Every structure is written in C-alpha cells, then in structure tokens.
Amino acid sequence: MNKLNFKQLFALVMITGLVASGCSSLNKTQKGVIIGAGAGGAVGAGVGKAAGNTALGAIIGAAVGGATGGIIGRKMDKQAEEMAKIPGAEVKRVGEGINVTFESGVLFGVDQATLNSDAQTKIKDLAAILNKNPDTYILIEGHTDNSGTSSHNMALSERRAKAVSNFLSAQNIASSRLKTAWYGESQPKVANDSESNKAQNRRVEFAIYANEKLVEEAKVEAAKG
C-alpha cells in the first residue's frame, strides 16, 4: 500500500468525513442531493483510492487547484445543481468535479444489464446537461454487491458500465469524453450485511471533471484576475 504524505492524509480525512456526514442525512424521497467536499488541488488520485472510491480519486487526481480550480469549481456548481434534479441521482460536488451515483435497482432489473425505460429517461436527462457542458470527461463505473461469484459480479458490472456508456454515446456524447471501469464487488460503499446495504453497493457511479480545454480557459480567466 502506498504511503500518503501529510497533505494527502489530511485531505483524505476531510473528504471522507464530509462525504460520510452528507450521505448519512440523505432522504430517499429527495430527487437528489449536492454534497460539497472541497479537495484542494495537489492531492492526487491516490487519496481517492485510499478512501476506497476510484471515482473520487479520478476527480481529485484531475484537480489543478488555486484560482484556476476555483473557476472550474464554479462551473461545476451549476451543472451539479441541474443534475440534482434528476430523480434517483445522488450528486456530490467534490473538489473541481462531480460524482453522480445511481443505485443499480434504479437503472436495471435484477441481474440485468439493459437500461429500463425509466432509467433511459434519467440518463437522457443527465446527457442533456452533459451536452450543454461539453468540456468535461466522464468516467462511468459499474459496481455490484457480493451476491453470486466474484467473476459473475465483475462481468455484470462491466456490462452495466458499458450499457450506460453506449446509451450516453447514443445521446450524442462524444466517445472521446467517455471512459468505463468496472469493479464487481471489490469496492462496496458499505458492508454487505443487509439487503438495504447491498442495494447501495449495486450502483453505477459517474466522475465528471474538466478536460484540457476547460482547464486552459480557466487559467486564462484566472490570469485576468
């Protein structure tokens, strides 16, 4: 396991504490929630991995910090507010990016990797926001609980991540913006010790963060003061 320096460790404690406290207060009837968790610019992807969340790691690893990061963050604020209106979406503002989570039960049937009609509506709503804000990358992750074999769960999480990615492509999201990853049962949010916890672990996560064009534009704006 890689050792974290003091700055990384401090950021990890702050981030995980903020996210945990925010998530504990979620109301299942809410359409969405935005959780702020400023990360700082120099932390790196290792912090997210140490926290057991690679989507978080992708966002932190892409951070640039300083005035440039603040400009990017403000642009992400507006997108996150819109995304939080999508029913079933858990939306977290993390540093200079956005982490969106849908429980798999919201998107797929049991042991299935075909988006149901309601799920298609939700992902179309997400795609509409992403299309209005084209200067971002989108990482799509598939996760499962520990029911079934690890190999089955890994394959299922792969099919689900790719199903969402393909659907976004069909909504005119450029393929150059999309990246998929899948982890099966290896990255649970909570312990798989109850049906409600297992439902949380069966999920698709999105990490949305600035591309090079947005970073350069933010640098120019920051230089103007």
PLM ranges: what are they?
Residues 2-10:
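Bacterial N-terminal signal peptides that target proteins for export
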Residues 18-22:
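C-terminal motif of bacterial Sec signal peptides marking the signal peptidase cleavage site
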Residues 24-81:
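Short, low-complexity, glycine-enriched hydrophobic/amphipathic alpha-helices that associate
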Residues 33-38, 42, 63, 78, ...:
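Extracytoplasmic/secreted proteins, especially bacterial periplasmic and envelope-associated proteins
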Residues 70, 74, 86-89, 94, ...:
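Structured segments of extracytoplasmic/periplasmic soluble domains
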Residues 75-106:
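Amphipathic, membrane-active segments
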Residues 107-142, 169, 206-208, 213-225:
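Periplasmic peptidoglycan-binding/anchoring modules of Gram-negative envelope and division proteins
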Residues 143-217:
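Periplasmic OmpA-like peptidoglycan-binding domain that tethers envelope proteins to the cell wall
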